[in-house]
Amino acid sequence: MRFVVTLFVSLCSALTAHAGQSAALERGTAIIDPLALRELDHGRLGLSGIFRPAGSSGAEITGSQLFALPAMAPVRRALDDEYDRYIARHTSSLPNESIGVGTAFDFQLFDRALLYSNDTRFVLAGIVNRMDRSYLSEANCGEIRLIYRLARMGAPEIGENAVSPRLPMTLNVVLKAKGDHEIDSNGAAITCAAIARRWLAAGDLAVTGTELAEKLVSKDGPLDLIKPENIDRIETNLQIAHAPKSAIRDFRTDYLMKVFNYNAKAQIFEQAPLENQIDRERILADEDLKRDFKTWLLDPTHFGELDRGTILIPDKFLATVAVAPTPVGFTSSDLQPAFGLVQGDGATADPVFKESDVVAALKKAADAGLTLQNIRSPAGFERRLNDVTCSGCHQTRGIGGFHFPGVDWMAAKPSNSTVVPASPHFFGDQVRRRDILTTLRDGTQPDFSRGFSSRPQSRGSTELAGTAYEDGWGALCYQQKPDAADNDISFRSWTCAEGLACQAVDKASRMGMCFVKGR
């Protein structure tokens, strides 16, 4: 595990050094300019402008004020309950390792009092277009996500080596890209094509800071269409605890994830299942649920959706909380959400899916005329089962447990920040997302499919070739066997760029990273 952590730090350092080169990848699909985000945060896209608490008059909303809102009462209760359950589970499973707030403990809890403090608030860290998810609701044209990062208020401007006031929690406000309004402020129809056109045009703007912010919220800008009434849900991601390396364990951090749907009629946020977060413990403990899940998922239609990454698993199989430990490394373990569901993990004598079940499903899909892109072997099925979950995706090529920690515009020189705003997975997926935006703008049918979280689809091979996002130094790869026929068909294309070789980290799966040959 120590080797994996060292590799991850080195990879993040390499990405930082090339942040300027990779900046173009998010053009038209995300807003990460720190100076523009600072202006937007101080305007109507600050969290107070989105939640509009009575009497706020556009002022900053503190953590205590936010969680005192009636709409947020269920969120606070749910987070407090999860804290208590997390501590109880830890005390039961690891009685010899202390847990609490502060460095004196083996597992150091995030101080939940900071959530409800007058001295903290959520600041706008980034804005992400997710119209690539419009297959879930064509009428709403997908989603726009406002990502906020918890931070201490009143902290002095930080220098290059000072500690940032930002804290390890994000609050993601997910809005419908298209709400109920049919006409924009210019009198034109609001369509998916029109929204996509605005975003792609914004990606061509060669300005920054205040000027960029003004153009983004102008009548023709993509952010003019963002309205509080379009809120669909909020998603929270909190580093609930971290354990420094010790004599008995490697470094570990746990991230707690929750989702709360907005009930417009009741005007409150209600706890909801996490999308595709398979409830492993509940399924393995219930024979009827296990049978139903197996039957549902191996149906050729659903199997094909799983392969394409467009599946939506029914709520009855899902959990309402996810804890994502990081780093998980390359070896299959119970830290991964789908561990024990597929034969071979070693976690259970009676898995949900035997290898013969997957082989039969592959044949059935082929007989039905389905061309599978990713799941072409039992190992491919197992990997996909992990990475469609919230926690499994966040464990893959993330920055800790985050995919979008955001730009630190509180830094002394935010335009030259040395902090990478998003994960390798995020940047590696931007070509696919922009391709979908382009097809939506042009009125053609998008290809909503996506590759594994570990490796982008080949549709970005030209733009991503030679980078750490695909086959460059530090990219994830599959070490080829001497006889090509013995290679796993799901991963045999995961090779390295010229001059690099795949160094396997996990000998069983042959998964590794691309490094200079001979090293």
Model-identified regions with their sequence ranges:
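Secreted, cysteine-rich disulfide-bonded mini-domains of extracellular proteins
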Residues: 458-519
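Primarily the internal scaffold of c-type cytochrome electron-transfer domains
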Residues: 397-446
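The canonical Cys-X-X-Cys-His
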Residues: 387-397
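Sec/Tat signal peptide C-region and signal peptidase I cleavage site
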Residues: 15-19
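Short, charged low-complexity linear segments at domain edges
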Residues: 352-376, 468-481
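Short, flexible, mixed-charge glycine/proline-rich loop motifs
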Residues: 378-385
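Bacterial N-terminal signal peptides
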Residues: 5-14
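Conserved small-residue
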Residues: 20-361, 426, 431, 435-465, ...
